[in-house]
C-alpha cells in the first residue's frame, strides 16, 4: 500500500531513481494505492542529463508493493520494495524498459504496455 509521502523506486529507464507519492488518484477520499493504481509523484533523485529531472511532477503507476496482494485463488504475493513506472499524459510508459518483476494485476488494470516491457510478470 502506497500513501502520500511514500518513497518509491522508479522501475524504468526514464532517468528517475527515487520518487515520492504526492497524491493518490481515484476519488477525494482514496488514501492508499495498490498495484495498478495511478499516483502523482515528485522525482527526488535522478540521473544527470536524463529526460526526467529532480523536482519534476509526473503521473505514475504502482507496479510493486511491499504490502502483500491477495489473489482470487487465495495466494499472496509481495515484493521487496515499492516501485512505480512513470507515465506520460496518455497514461503510456515514458521509458522503453522496465526493470525488475511486475505484478500480474497490471493486466487487469489495462497497463498492457507496462506488462509487455517488463522482464518478468509474477
From Swiss-Prot:
One of its GO terms (biological process) is translation. The keyword Ribonucleoprotein applies. One of its GO terms (cellular component) is cytosolic large ribosomal subunit. It comes from the Bacteria. Keywords: Ribonucleoprotein, Ribosomal protein, RNA-binding, rRNA-binding. InterPro entries: Ribosomal_uL14, Ribosomal_uL14_bac-type, Ribosomal_uL14_CS, Ribosomal_uL14_sf. SUPFAM superfamilies: Ribosomal protein L14. The keyword Signal does not apply. SMART domains: Ribosomal_L14 (SM01374). GO terms for molecular function: large ribosomal subunit rRNA binding; structural constituent of ribosome. Part of the 50S ribosomal subunit. Forms a cluster with proteins L3 and L19. In the 70S ribosome, L14 and L19 interact and together make contacts with the 16S rRNA in bridges B5 and B8. NCBIfam families: rplN_bact. Binds to 23S rRNA. Forms part of two intersubunit bridges in the 70S ribosome. Belongs to the universal ribosomal protein uL14 family. This is Large ribosomal subunit protein uL14.
Amino acid at each position: 500500500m502506497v500513501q502520500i509521502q511514500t518513497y518509491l523506486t522508479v522501475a524504468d529507464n526514464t532517468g528517475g531513481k527515487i520518487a515520492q507519492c504526492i497524491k493518490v488518484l481515484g476519488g477525494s477520499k482514496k488514501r492508499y494505492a495498490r498495484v495498478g493504481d495511478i499516483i502523482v509523484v515528485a522525482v527526488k533523485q535522478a540521473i544527470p542529463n536524463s529526460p526526467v529531472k529532480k523536482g519534476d511532477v509526473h503521473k505514475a503507476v504502482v507496479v510493486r508493493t511491499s504490502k502483500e496482494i491477495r489473489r482470487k485463488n487465495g495466494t499472496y504475493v509481495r515484493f521487496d520494495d515499492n516501485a512505480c513506472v512513470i507515465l506520460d499524459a496518455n497514461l503510456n510508459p515514458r521509458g522503453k524498459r522496465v526493470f525488475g518483476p511486475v505484478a500480474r494485476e497490471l493486466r487487469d488494470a489495462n497497463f498492457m504496455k507496462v506488462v509487455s516491457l517488463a522482464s518478468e510478470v509474477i
